[in-house]
């Protein structure tokens, strides 16, 4: 059994146990209604299934922190079924099924350092860096003067993913993307 904490100590990206399953806290909200007891509404992602649920706790409740191994690894390659990662300290290779990565796989780049979460030796989750730099390999050309950032166009990046970018972005440009949302952050000059 893991460590228990008061629900008021919950933080984003914390790992908790709910109904015997490990969850990652995506967001939370302390609610203090005019009448009745305060409560905490938690939006959490099941680390095994990927399902996102909302859980409501009374402010007096405590929660159990999930207890599993976290290892920093580097992405190596995809073999059609699994994504392979290498532990930079030991040289160990770990295969992570595509189902565990889900949509995050579209932002994986060779050599990218990630955190792999293991439950009894089995990979149950992967955390990519919050943002990363990608090269635009395909998009409609931008025109001089197109500096408005509110209008977006699709662009294919070097991992094959398609993201929305401002009109002034051209093929060959390097851009920073939020890997959690897939949103454009900024153009990078290298």
UniProtKB/Swiss-Prot annotation:
Which Gene3D superfamilies does its entry note? 2.30.30.30, Nucleic acid-binding proteins
The entry lists its GO molecular-function terms as: translation elongation factor activity
Coarse class of the primary localization is cytoplasm
Compartment(s) = Cytoplasm
Q: Could you list this entry's UniProt keywords, alphabetically sorted.
A: Cytoplasm, Elongation factor, Protein biosynthesis
A biological process term (GO) from this entry: peptide biosynthetic process
* GO CC term, one of those recorded: cytoplasm
Please indicate which superkingdom the organism of origin belongs to: Bacteria
Where is the secretion signal located?
none
Q: In which pathway does it act?
A: Protein biosynthesis; polypeptide chain elongation
| Role, per record | Involved in peptide bond synthesis. Stimulates efficient translation and peptide-bond synthesis on native or reconstituted 70S ribosomes in vitro. Probably functions indirectly by altering the affinity of the ribosome for aminoacyl-tRNA, thus increasing their reactivity as acceptors for peptidyl transferase.
Q: Which family does it belong to?
A: Belongs to the elongation factor P family.
HAMAP family listed in its UniProt record:
EF_P
Name of this chain's protein: Elongation factor P
Q: What is the name of the gene encoding this protein? A: efp
């Amino acid at each position: 059994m893991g460590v228990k904490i008061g629900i008021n100590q919950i933080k984003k990206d914390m790992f908790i146990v709910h109904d015997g399953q490990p969850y990652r806290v995506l967001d939370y909200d302390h609610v203090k209604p005019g009448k009745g007891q305060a409560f905490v509404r938690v939006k959490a992602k099941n680390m095994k299934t990927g399902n996102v649920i909302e859980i409501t706790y009374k402010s007096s409740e405590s929660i159990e922190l999930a207890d599993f191994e976290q290892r920093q690894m580097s992405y190596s390659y995809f073999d059609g079924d699994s994504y392979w990662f290498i532990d930079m300290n030991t040289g160990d290779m770990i295969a992570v099924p595509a189902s565990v990565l889900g949509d995050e796989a579209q932002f994986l780049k060779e050599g990218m350092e990630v955190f792999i979460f293991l439950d009894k030796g089995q990979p149950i989750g992967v955390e990519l860096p919050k943002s990363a730099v990608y090269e635009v390999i395909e998009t409609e050309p931008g025109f001089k003067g197109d500096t408005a950032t509110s209008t977006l166009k699709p662009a294919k990046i070097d991992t094959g993913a398609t993201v929305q970018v401002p009109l002034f972005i051209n093929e060959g440009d390097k851009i920073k993307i939020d890997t959690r949302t897939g949103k454009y952050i900024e153009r990078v000059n290298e």
